């Protein structure tokens, strides 16, 4: 059971907390945008339940919507996410019987929960923030996934996330003593944020697509060390496509980014079980994927996770690289 914010005009701020049972497996996209990752998660679940249409309505209301969470900072994207999910569920044949909202909230993921939210926002937004705070504080988030923003010059410099990032500046207890580094990039903060949720829960999966620089840049050695200590298994698919360094395929042919951006990107999956001990570092598995954009897309569509030919790495001091040397 966890405390859930509930509307009650008899209490200060019009809200009170009531203990309720929640599903143990909770999904969170901390940078939901227009809801693409959340929509795909719902679509995948629906596809597995085809042929059980009679159960779908009940499943959505009692077991799906209570598990799916998303945070978004921008009002326009937040509104679009709600519209996209509403249309998707209607297309699946879902017809709601309860007045149940999507658990997509207007909030900044990288800010810690605020206990006195009611004094900070207008009434309608106060309830929104209170429910987001409950997830930040209490929800047993076991899956964190998405495509968080990238920004080398981050404006998310709050005390809470900055303190968490400090952990990435140490390797085996020693500070890395660098003043110029890229640990303040937003995507690094979102990885640390997701890691924090999984650590707090004791087990879970963190899965992002984000810039690939942290895989092999020496300045990220403390970050890699910290991830090695936290997780049991780490899988990375380096999609390359970095036009900043004019990446090419090994055969000299063009290597194209999967997105219309200059930074190369990678798919990263971090898995933690309750059996993990800090003394044992994570196993790391890696794959390089070069070539045309369409070829990369096709590979990812055709291959199930078990079919991907990962290479096992052996990250070593002093840099603990997550890529082939």
Give a label for each model feature.
Residues 155-160, 164, 174-178, 196-325:
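Sequence-level detector for compositionally biased, low-complexity segments
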Residues 1-236, 246:
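SAM-dependent methyltransferase catalytic region
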